């Protein structure tokens, strides 16, 4: 069992940064996007007590599917604009399944409207990122209510999301304010100048036909998030499109950035 394997590594006094989902809901294991919830790292002290370690611990990454829209929602929350309801449809690249077109030829000219387990992760994991620390554990947030559909599309790299959001009554920001919040948002990796931290975490593109995978997936070397097409909606308050690199920001690269943050904050030290 992966949970057990990761704990065994940690018990050898080895810090573990994992892309696997096994420990994402273990109460004293932080699930971190470095710009969004670095404060969750404080539960590591309690986790070490449970594991009986001095240097070893586990930190995990959230699912790649949520990286294209959770930063956009988080920036608004931090600015005092709480989304109440969110609908997101993700269009996910085949590399997210560890595949290429060579070994998954049936994906050419095809769309598959189901990815096992992704919708549950996409709806629940943002709530854990927005949770709070209580008695050495992370307690997930109550809202917003998120519903998702996750679709596999014939693209090698890059997860796109079409997102609809409604705010609390009387707390709907203007379009200009939302774009300002997105463009100005930064987090601890930017403050600390971590080696792989994007200079500008979020870019907003004004063109109607952006973001595009072929043009924007490698924004900030794949560590940034590209947003566009923000406009008012007839059912919800606003809709927009997000794009992130699923294997850089969403997987291995994001894990490296977490390791850089852990070192900068003194959690990873020389033996």
Residue spans of the language-model regions?
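Hydrophobic alpha-helical scaffolding
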Residues: 62, 112-117, 245-248
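Active-site-lining helix/loop region of Rossmann-like oxidoreductase modules
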Residues: 52-55, 67-190
């Amino acid at each position: 069992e992966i949970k057990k394997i990761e704990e065994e590594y940690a018990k050898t006094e080895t810090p573990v940064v994992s892309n696997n989902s096994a420990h994402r809901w273990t109460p004293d294991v932080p699930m971190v996007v470095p710009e969004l919830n670095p404060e969750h790292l404080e539960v590591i002290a309690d986790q070490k007590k449970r594991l009986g370690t001095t240097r070893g611990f586990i930190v995990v990454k959230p699912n790649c599917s949520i990286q294209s829209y959770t930063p956009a929602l988080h920036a608004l929350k931090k600015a005092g604009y709480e989304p109440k309801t969110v609908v997101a449809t993700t269009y996910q690249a085949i590399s997210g399944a560890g595949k290429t077109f060579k070994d998954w030829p049936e994906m050419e000219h095809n769309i598959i409207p189901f990815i096992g387990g992704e919708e549950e992760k996409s709806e629940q994991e943002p709530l854990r990122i927005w949770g709070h620390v209580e008695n050495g554990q992370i307690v997930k947030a109550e809202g917003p209510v998120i519903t998702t559909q996750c679709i596999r599309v014939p693209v090698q790299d890059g997860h796109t999301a079409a997102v609809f959001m409604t705010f609390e009554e009387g707390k709907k920001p203007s379009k200009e304010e939302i774009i300002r919040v997105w463009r100005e948002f930064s987090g601890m990796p930017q403050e600390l100048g971590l080696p792989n931290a994007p200079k500008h975490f979020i870019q907003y593109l004004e063109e109607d036909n952006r973001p595009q995978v072929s043009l924007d997936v490698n924004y900030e070397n794949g560590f940034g998030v590209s947003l566009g097409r923000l406009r008012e909606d007839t059912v919800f308050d606003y809709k927009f499109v997000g794009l992130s690199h699923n294997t850089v920001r969403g997987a291995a690269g994001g894990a490296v950035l977490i390791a850089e943050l852990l070192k900068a904050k003194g959690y990873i030290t020389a033996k």
